[in-house]
């Protein structure tokens, strides 16, 4: 699943390509991709004729304000979650639909933003301007603070973890604790912090918690700079792979030597997810 760096990369691409993008026509090929009230028919009816405004990211959600003509007031919201394999593709000219295309959106000049999703778990919503997206999408409402926000700090994390018996890996995957982190960057940040992913959350001391906060934000910043990670399906709008995977410390490196100490990287299921760590560097 695309995590914070990948979704941030997509957001930046959408912000660049869809600046003042007037929605002239929409084709929903797979109705189940639309999760908002009224389904695909209401989605198409409500967004045609509107202009895309500011794109933002909240956790793994993409949020776009929509506007009528040149008016500044918001005429609705377009929200997207890529889930496992969702991706946007940009086409400057009219192009035939490709396999796994779910939604196609054009401007009057024929430029297209296309939503392609192999597993078909991705979701889109149209939200009326009378509501905020958080009022209609439960997942958005439950999100914890962003890793780069002031709210995400060692004191906050210590308070959030002090009664949790679950592993620290499980806690970092919990979107109500920190928004946007996922399997890849939980493994990577725990390696950099020198902490075993199986360690019980409430047993972490202040120094360890501070290391986790620092490591997570550091790893996320590096990955954003590399355009994210492309181990499987992720591409940006132009079809370019993310480059972080080539420098990953542990993720995807089972049985390979640790980049720090040379000991073989281990992999096992933790919190139901394939988890990588160095048995020597992490305690």
From Swiss-Prot:
DNA binds at residues 100, 119, 164. It comes from the Bacteria. Gene3D superfamilies: 1.10.8.50, MutM-like, N-terminal (3.20.190.10). The keyword DNA repair applies. SMART domains: Fapy_DNA_glyco, H2TH. Involved in base excision repair of DNA damaged by oxidation or by mutagenic agents. Acts as a DNA glycosylase that recognizes and removes damaged bases. Has a preference for oxidized purines, such as 7,8-dihydro-8-oxoguanine (8-oxoG). Has AP (apurinic/apyrimidinic) lyase activity and introduces nicks in the DNA strand. Cleaves the DNA backbone by beta-delta elimination to generate a single-strand break at the site of the removed base with both 3'- and 5'-phosphates. Its EC number is 3.2.2.23, 4.2.99.18. GO terms for molecular function: 8-oxo-7,8-dihydroguanine DNA N-glycosylase activity; class I DNA-(apurinic or apyrimidinic site) endonuclease activity; damaged DNA binding; zinc ion binding. The gene is mutM. Belongs to the FPG family. NCBIfam families: fpg, PRK01103.1, PRK13945.1. Binds 1 zinc ion per subunit. The active site is at residues 2-3, 60, 273. InterPro entries: DNA_glyclase/AP_lyase_DNA-bd, DNA_glyclase_Znf_dom_DNA_BS, Formamido-pyr_DNA_Glyclase, FPG_cat, MutM-like_N-ter, Ribosomal_uS13-like_H2TH, Znf_DNA_glyclase/AP_lyase, Znf_FPG/IleRS. Monomer. Its cofactor is Zn(2+). It catalyses: Hydrolysis of DNA containing ring-opened 7-methylguanine residues, releasing 2,6-diamino-4-hydroxy-5-(N-methyl)formamidopyrimidine; 2'-deoxyribonucleotide-(2'-deoxyribose 5'-phosphate)-2'-deoxyribonucleotide-DNA = a 3'-end 2'-deoxyribonucleotide-(2,3-dehydro-2,3-deoxyribose 5'-phosphate)-DNA + a 5'-end 5'-phospho-2'-deoxyribonucleoside-DNA + H(+). GO terms for biological process: base-excision repair. Signal peptide: none annotated. Pfam families: Fapy_DNA_glyco (PF01149), H2TH (PF06831), zf-FPG_IleRS (PF06827). This is Formamidopyrimidine-DNA glycosylase. A zinc finger (FPG-type) spans 249-283. Keywords: DNA damage, DNA repair, DNA-binding, Glycosidase, Hydrolase, Lyase, Metal-binding, Multifunctional enzyme, Zinc, Zinc-finger.
């Amino acid at each position: 699943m695309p995590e914070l760096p990948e979704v941030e990369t997509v957001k930046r691409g959408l912000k660049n390509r869809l600046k003042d993008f007037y929605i002239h026509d929409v084709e929903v090929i797979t109705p189940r991709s639309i999760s908002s009230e009224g389904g695909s028919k209401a989605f198409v009816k409500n967004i045609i004729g509107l202009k895309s405004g500011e794109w933002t990211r909240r956790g793994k959600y993409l949020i776009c304000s929509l506007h009528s003509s040149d008016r500044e007031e918001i005429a609705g919201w377009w929200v997207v979650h890529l889930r496992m394999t969702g991706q946007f593709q940009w086409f400057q000219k009219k192009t035939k639909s490709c396999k796994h295309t779910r939604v196609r959106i054009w401007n009057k000049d024929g430029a297209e933003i296309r939503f392609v999703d192999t597993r078909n778990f991705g979701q889109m919503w149209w939200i009326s301007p009378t509501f905020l997206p958080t009022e209609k999408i439960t997942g958005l409402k439950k999100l914890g603070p962003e890793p780069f926000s002031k709210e995400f700090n060692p004191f906050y994390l210590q308070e959030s973890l002090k009664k949790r018996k679950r592993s620290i890996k499980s806690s970092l995957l919990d979107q109500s604790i920190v928004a946007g982190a996922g399997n890849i960057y939980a493994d990577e940040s725990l390696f950099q912090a020198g902490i075993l992913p199986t360690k019980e959350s409430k047993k972490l001391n202040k120094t360890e918690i501070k290391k986790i906060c620092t490591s997570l934000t550091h790893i996320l910043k590096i990955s954003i700079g590399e355009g994210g990670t492309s181990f499987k399906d992720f591409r940006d709008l132009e079809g370019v792979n993310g480059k972080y995977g080539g420098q990953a410390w542990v993720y995807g490196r089972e049985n390979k030597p640790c980049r720090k100490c040379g000991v073989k990287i281990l992999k096992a299921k933790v919190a139901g997810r394939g988890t990588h760590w160095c048995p020597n560097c992490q305690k």
